[in-house]
A protein has these predicted regions:
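Mid-domain beta-loop-alpha active-site segment that forms a flexible
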Residues: 1-3, 7, 49-50, 55, ...
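Short, charged, surface-exposed secondary-structure boundary motifs
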Residues: 1-3, 78-81, 95, 161-165
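Short gly/ser/thr-rich secondary-structure transition/capping motifs
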Residues: 22-30, 78-85, 106-111, 133-134, ...
Length: 226
């Protein structure tokens, strides 16, 4: 959740562009790096499960943002921080930041496509720290090129399997679409690392050990998925 908020702010504050200027020793305060105050922005959280709910809380309580949300199963724990909308379209249409937090299913592949991006408020920021298959990457790039979307932070990518977690510094990517994402200043791309903290890795290890002991003792585990 904290990673999502950080990346959203980095896009709003033109982080990549500022860093490029710094590397060039260009320290001018130009219109291209003028930003907005986060507290003045409306945020749409699509999917308010555990992570989405925390994102909503951080934006609402930490930054005093107006937060709207959509989830087919609204959470009572999240309601103090958001105004739930009846549809995704209604949630995104006036949002300055749209962040998505939902699992990948057979029903939501390319949910965020050309038609969906055209419903965004012009100049909105898009954040995907959920699943790459939710987003039509080419449609997103087109929306950014047209100025419909200001920029995006992507911790997931639809073709990441077999690429992310590997070192391609010698052999190259052979993926023009990912290359374009990486080289653009208005997009921040990271290799699915939002979860990658010391605390999270500890939890993964302990959960695996607990599940192993549970299977040995009972023949099954509450973490069983099949």
């Amino acid at each position: 959740a904290e990673f999502t908020v950080t990346q959203a702010i980095n896009i709003v504050r033109h982080f990549n562009h500022v860093q490029r200027k710094m590397r060039l020793h260009d320290f001018r305060w130009e219109a291209s790096i003028l930003s907005q105050s986060i507290k003045d922005l409306k945020v749409a959280v699509i999917g308010t499960g555990h992570i989405g709910g925390i994102v909503a809380q951080i934006f609402s309580e930490g930054y005093l943002c107006d937060v709207v949300a959509y989830d087919p199963f609204p959470s009572e724990h999240v309601k103090p921080y958001v105004t739930y909308k009846q549809s995704i379209n209604e949630a995104i249409k006036e949002a300055d930041i749209v962040t998505i937090h939902m699992p990948s299913t057979q029903y939501n592949n390319y949910l965020f496509n050309e038609n969906m991006f055209q419903m965004f408020k012009k100049g909105a920021v898009f954040v995907n720290c959920a699943r790459g298959s939710l987003v039509d990457t080419k449609a997103l790039l087109s929306a950014i090129e047209q100025g419909q979307i200001k920029g995006a932070a992507l911790d997931t990518y639809e073709y990441e399997i077999g690429v992310y977690t590997t070192d391609r510094s010698e052999e190259g990517l052979n993926d023009p679409l990912l290359e374009e994402l990486i080289t653009r200043e208005d997009i921040i791309v990271t290799p699915h690392i939002a979860f990658y903290t010391e605390e999270a890795i500890k939890h993964l290890i302990f959960d695996a050990l607990d599940a192993t002991m549970e299977v040995l003792n009972t023949g099954t585990t509450e973490l069983r998925v099949n």
